[in-house]
Amino acid sequence: MQIRMTEYQVPDPESGPYGITVCANGRIWFTEQKGNRIGMLTESGDITEYTIPTESAGASIITSGIDGELWFTEYKAGKIGKITPQGKITEYALPPGAAPFGIAAGCDDAMWYTDMAGHQIGRLSSSGEITEYKLPKPGAFPSFITRGADGALWFTQNQSGSIGRITADGDISEYPLPQEQSGPVGITAGPDGALWFTEINANQIGRITVSGKISEYQLPTAHARPHAIAAGGDGALWFTEWGAGQIGRITVDGDITEYPIPTADSEPHGIAAGSAHSIWFAEECGRIGKISIQN
């Protein structure tokens, strides 16, 4: 398989692009963690930016909601943000002390998020009502969250070295990983019905079935520090290697390929699938990257 990699410079090179998602209309939305903005990139490379009302909000993960709008976390401000396709931003304040990070749409028309500081999973209803669910173990540091094929929300617990699952009713299950200090971060639903996740400390990609069976795959590059992961339209999983400045691809059979990013010290974080032949990723160095898959 051949690929072509393209990079787009954001207006402020110090803005720190972090999270990224692709809308149904093909437009790419991303957070600027240091620039305190939400950016929108068209397929032709034009970028529009929208300033977040709260200063130094710490915008992190962004995702599409069931309502067609974009939802993002503000971990420093303790808020959940929503932005319309036209750029109108609404913020929802969480209970004091919250530090939301991961966010995903559930099957119940609500947005679910992880609270790293409160060690809990939160639910924000379409009417703005907030419900919180404490995790069994304190200090778990829940990170990314995604909806699984079973309708539940699955999330990584970075400090406890485990994968968590929560139902729409708030029932929580935990699945310890073989290495307690593996540091799981990103997680996504795979094309095989399983959940795939990154292990930033163990330098591995993990897979867990909805019944809890775990498999792990070691990365070829040492100290790659895999971060985010997304299911591509080509039937494989794509992930960022924050420490190595590479984008990785793993098939459902566990075959891994790595692609170096042209820009040095790119520090890739978020990643998302576009069309069947494109993958987009955010580089903290001030760029948005695109992989075009050429069969």
From Swiss-Prot:
Cross-referenced InterPro entries: Streptogrm_lyase, Vgb, WD40/YVTN_repeat-like_dom_sf
Cofactors: Mg(2+)
The entry marks the following residues as binding substrate, namely: H227
Query: Which Pfam families does the record associate with it?
Result: Vgb_lyase (PF24684)
- What are its GO cellular component terms? outer membrane-bounded periplasmic space
Q: Which GO terms describe its molecular function?
A: carbon-oxygen lyase activity; magnesium ion binding
In terms of SUPFAM superfamilies, this protein maps to:
NHL repeat
Q: Name one GO biological process term.
A: antibiotic catabolic process
For this UniProt record, the keywords arranged alphabetically read as follows:
Antibiotic resistance, Lyase, Magnesium, Metal-binding
Q: What Enzyme Commission number(s) appear in the record?
A: 4.2.99.-
EC top class, in one word? lyase
Residues recorded as binding Mg(2+), renumbered to this chain, are E267, E284
Question: Where does the record place the catalytic residues?
Answer: H269 (proton acceptor)
Q: Which domain of life is it from?
A: Bacteria
Family statement? Belongs to the Vgb family.
- Summarize subunit and interaction data from the UniProt record for this chain: Monomer.
Name the PANTHER family on file. VIRGINIAMYCIN B LYASE
- What is the role of this chain? Inactivates the type B streptogramin antibiotics by linearizing the lactone ring at the ester linkage, generating a free phenylglycine carboxylate and converting the threonyl moiety into 2-amino-butenoic acid.
The record's annotation in HAMAP family points to: VirginiamycinB_lyase (MF_01282)
- What name has this protein been given in UniProt? Virginiamycin B lyase
Write the lineage as a comma-separated list: Bacteria, Bacillati, Bacillota, Bacilli, Bacillales
